[in-house]
Amino acid sequence: MASTTPSKLLENAMKYADQPALSTPSVDGWVTETWAEVAECVMDIARALVGLDFNHGDKLSLYSYNCKEWYGGYLAAQMVGGAGVGVYHTSSAEEVEWVVSNSESKVVFVGNNPMAAGDNSKMPQHRLMEVIDALDKVEHVVLLPGVGGVEHAKLMTWNTFIGHGSSIETATLHERMGALTEEDTSALIYTSGTTGNPKGVELTHGNFNFEVKAADFAFTFHQGERYVSWLPLAHVFGQLIDNHYWVDKGLHMYVADNPLNVVDLAKEVQPHLFIGVPRIYEKLYSNVRAAIDGKAILRIGLKLPLLSGIFRKILKKKTGMKACRFAVTGAAPINPDILELFQSLGIPIFEGYGMTEDTAGATLNYAEQNRVGTVGTVFPGTEMKVADDGELLIRGPHVMKGYYKNQTATDEVLKDDWLYTGDVGTIDGDGFVKI
């Protein structure tokens, strides 16, 4: 049997059965589920998919912000031989129509958009209803718990959906998992170019496996350590860490109720691992600078060796980084001043580089090998070179299978196993990459 994230999930359910795996927000506070409970949820969803004739190669679109059912559906689709297709919770009706149609999704999960600000027209179920009749390949639309207000022949509630799996034996799920290979597609992630419709990047179980293991050269986390899920799961970074890395390392993941609340959530949870983008670190940077500049004693404390440790702890706690052992920034350039300040405070934020087409990461700085102003050195097992025109090329086991149903576009960027990134960069004598 190929090594896959669903098979690792079942291992966790045995090894860490009663250990916390997932904490989701509710009106009464956090609801925490163990690895055994998460695995049972995934298997219930997998049974239901099989009961709806979801077969090898079929696609499940997930149109929602981060939630338990998103993770569960994604892993369940993979468990039974299919693939997950993330749809941004903020996507317009036209964008949803393209992704769901182009991916040939058989089933669609519809959930919440916490950024709708009370505007029902921006909620996923209403936007999907605008285009549902054009989605002829969609056989079933499943409303996640708490979602309603719409009617259509293809719709079903969550409880009705789960009921479709009542007669499916657990042995059937194990048979499906046993038939998986590392070359099987596990996800389609849609990425926008400068022109035309988004392209579906086809990533395999092997792509994700390599990426998860390769990260160990820079950081290693252990069962039970805390992580905050806030990046939209339709994004490759969120999908990699919040699904595959979470399960592989057995992290305790806390889910944000809204991506706008991530800073406050980090302060509450004090995660060991944090994944962000420059705008989040810019906000943290502004808070730290204000604290330093606004209080003379803090400015003195940061300069005096006897006091610096005390004030560093205060500032790390205020930013939600008291327990943080590694934080990553990527997706866009970051001001080097931000990295230098945080690193001087003992907050290990490092810049990396990658793209959807290489399963998120290709280079990374880390404590033992860090050069601010660069995006670090390549992952072990990854090759990178600069073409004659300055374009960066990447080769390795994390490079995509191709663009789904778009051989022309695939041939433009994959040549002799090299991925043409479209980014201009340099590689210095020590192997550090600069974009």
Where are the regions a protein language model picked out?
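Conserved AMP-binding/adenylate-forming core of the ANL superfamily
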Residues: A2, D18, L22-L75, S92-E97, ...
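Adenylate-forming
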Residues: Y65, V110-M129, P271-L341, E351-D358, ...
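Conserved pre-ATP/AMP-binding loop-to-beta segment of ANL
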Residues: D18-P20, L143, M156, T160-Y190, ...
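Conserved AMP-binding A3 loop
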Residues: T32-A36, S186-V212
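Conserved ATP-binding/catalytic segment of the ANL
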Residues: L52, V378-I435
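Structural core segment of the AMP-binding/adenylate-forming
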Residues: L10, M79-G163
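Conserved AMP-binding/adenylation subdomain of ANL enzymes
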Residues: G81, N209-R226, L233-I314, A323, ...
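A short helix-loop-beta submotif of the ANL/AMP-binding
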Residues: D58-K59, Y65-A93, W98-V107, E225-R226, ...
